[in-house]
Amino acid sequence: MRTSETHLEEALQEYNDKVNALEAEGSTEELLEALVNRSTILMLMGSYVSSITDLEDAMDIIREMEIEGKKPNVGTFVKVYENHGHMCYEEDVDMMLDDFQRIIPKLSLLNATTRHYDRKSLVHMSLECAKELVDADFAESSLPFLEKGLLFLGSMTDDWTMNRRAEMYSLMGEAHHDMGVYDEALKDFDRSLDIASELYLSNRLDEDMLVSFVYSFVLKGDIEDRNGDKEKSIADYESAADVLDQLENEGRNFDRELMLDMHRTLSRLLMEAGDVERAELHLMKAMKMEVPNVDIAIKNLGAGKKDH
C-alpha cells in the first residue's frame, strides 16, 4: 500500500524531471506552472526553504513576463503570491503585505473555474490572507479579501457556507474595530452573531468558528463599553462568558485567560451598575479559576468564625 509520503516523493521526482526539462527547453508558462506545483509538493513535505526558492523563481518569471507585456495565468499568479505571503508571515510581515497586495487587483478575475482554485479554496484563500493581515496590524488591506470572499460564498445556505459567512463578518468586524471604524464594526459583528447564534443553538457551529463567535461578543462589548452603553456591553460579555462556560462544561478546548478576563470585567461593570449580587457571582467564578476550591475555603472560614 502506497503511503502519502511515497506518493509525494514520486510526485517530487516527476516535477524535478519536468522542471529540468523545461529549463533546458520549454515555454516560460509551462516552467512557471511546474515551479508552482513543485513548490506545493515541497511545502507539503516540510521542505520550506526549497519551496520558497521555487516560488521566488516563479516570481522572477512573472516579472519577466510582465516586462514583456505577457499575462501569466491569473490562478497561477495568485497561487504564487498567496503561498509566498503565507510563508513570510512569521518572519517578514512587510513582505507578506507586499505579496497579498499584489493579489488584490486580481481578485475580481477569480472564479470557481480558475486554475489551482475552486469555490471552497477561494473562500479559504480569502479568509487566511485576511486573518494574517489583521493579525499583522494591516487591517485595512484585509477588507478586499473579505468583501470578495463573501461574493465567493454566494447565496448558498449549507452549514459550511453559513459558518464561513459568519466567520468573514466577524473578521471584518475585527478589522473595522482595529481601524477605529466602530459603527461599521458593530454592524459586522451583528451580522456575524445573527448567523452564528442560530448555528450554535442548533449545534451546527463548527470548531473553526467557535473562537470567532466568542470574540465577536467580546469586541462588540468593548465597543459598547467604550460608547458608554454599559447595559449592552454587559449583555455581550455575559454571552461570551456563557459560551466559554459551556465549552468548559463539555470538556472542550477554550481560552481560559479570556474566560477569566470576562468574569473580572463583568464583576467590575455590574458592581458599577449597582448589581452587587451578579457582580459577586462573576467575581467568585474568577476567583475559582485563579484559586481552585476557593469557595470551600470561604465556607470553612465562615464556619470557623461561627465556632468562635
Residue positions per predicted region:
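Residue-level detector of the short coil/turn that links helix A to helix B
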Residues: 6, 46, 91-92, 137, ...
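Amphipathic alpha-helical segments of tetratricopeptide repeats
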Residues: 19-20, 59-67, 101-112, 150-157, ...
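Residue signature of alpha-solenoid helical repeat architecture, marking inter-repeat boundaries
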Residues: 29, 71-75, 116-120, 160-163, ...
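Residue-level recognition of tetratricopeptide repeat
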Residues: 40, 79-82, 86, 124, ...
